[in-house]
Every structure is written in structure tokens, then in C-alpha cells.
Curated annotation (Swiss-Prot):
Biological process annotations from GO: DNA replication, synthesis of primer
Quaternary context: Homodimer. Interacts with PriA and DnaT. Component of the replication restart primosome. Primosome assembly occurs via a 'hand-off' mechanism. PriA binds to replication forks, subsequently PriB then DnaT bind; DnaT then displaces ssDNA to generate the helicase loading substrate.
Reported function: Involved in the restart of stalled replication forks, which reloads the replicative helicase on sites other than the origin of replication; the PriA-PriB pathway is the major replication restart pathway. During primosome assembly it facilitates complex formation between PriA and DnaT on DNA; stabilizes PriA on DNA. Stimulates the DNA unwinding activity of PriA helicase.
InterPro entries named among the record's database cross-references: NA-bd_OB-fold (IPR012340), Primosome_PriB/ssb (IPR000424), Prisomal_replication_PriB (IPR023646)
Lineage: Bacteria, Pseudomonadati, Pseudomonadota, Gammaproteobacteria, Pasteurellales
Protein name: Replication restart protein PriB
Pfam families: SSB_1 (PF22657)
Originating organism: Pasteurella multocida (strain Pm70)
Signal sequence range: none
Statement: the UniProt record of this protein carries the keyword DNA-binding: yes
Length: 108
């Protein structure tokens, strides 16, 4: 986006394969949560050259509207996940980016 029309936004989309068994639980205040790791692999063009892109991204889905859809997520499911990213502290105190899903779509 041009400097003269700068909007701050946080949108992130990633296609990948579920690489960890989803963890599903309900918080004490009744909000449903599902967490898993999405593994992405692709070929991207950068500076006129092809390069492999690869990452593992933790995904957090929160809200009762996701309960039914997340029941079908298993290791090996291919998904498109759209949401925003935020930093979380891991158990050992390191910062880690997490994709907070707002939409998911199964890819055949």
C-alpha cells in the first residue's frame, strides 16, 4: 500500500497440511478452542528466481461457531486458513507467531 494511503491491517492466509493432532477444549467461560500446526510448502518466485518456501505455523481457532467444522480436522487434512497473526509466548519464554483463524476451508 502507498505511504500516502497507509492502512494498518493484519490479514494472513496460508494453505497447508495439518501436521499435528488438533487439541480441542472449552475454556472455563465456555469458549471453544481448537489448536493445531499447519505445514506449508510451495515454490515462490523472488528476484526472478524460484525458491522453496516452507513453514510450520501454529493455528488457534476460538469460538463456538467453529466447533462443528473443526471436528473434521485431522492430521493430513489440507486447509486454507485465513485470519490474523499475533505473538504468543511459549512455555520456555520464546515468542512465536500464531495464526488466529477466522475462516477455514477444506481443500480436496
Amino acid at each position: 500500500m502507498l505511504k500516502s494511503n497507509l492502512n494498518i491491517d493484519n490479514r494472513f492466509s496460508l494453505i497447508g497440511i495439518v501436521a499435528s493432532q488438533p487439541k480441542r477444549h472449552q475454556s472455563p467461560n465456555g469458549i471453544y478452542h481448537c489448536q493445531f500446526v499447519l505445514e506449508h510448502r510451495s515454490i515462490q518466485e523472488e528476484a526472478g528466481l524460484s525458491r522453496q518456501a516452507w513453514c510450520k505455523m501454529p493455528v488457534q481457532m476460538s469460538g463456538n461457531q467453529f466447533r462443528e467444522k473443526t471436528q473434521s480436522i485431522t492430521v493430513g487434512s489440507q486447509l486454507l486458513v485465513v485470519g490474523f497473526i499475533s505473538s504468543h509466548k511459549t512455555a520456555n519464554g520464546l515468542s512465536q507467531l500464531v495464526l488466529h483463524a477466522e475462516q477455514i476451508e477444506f481443500i480436496d
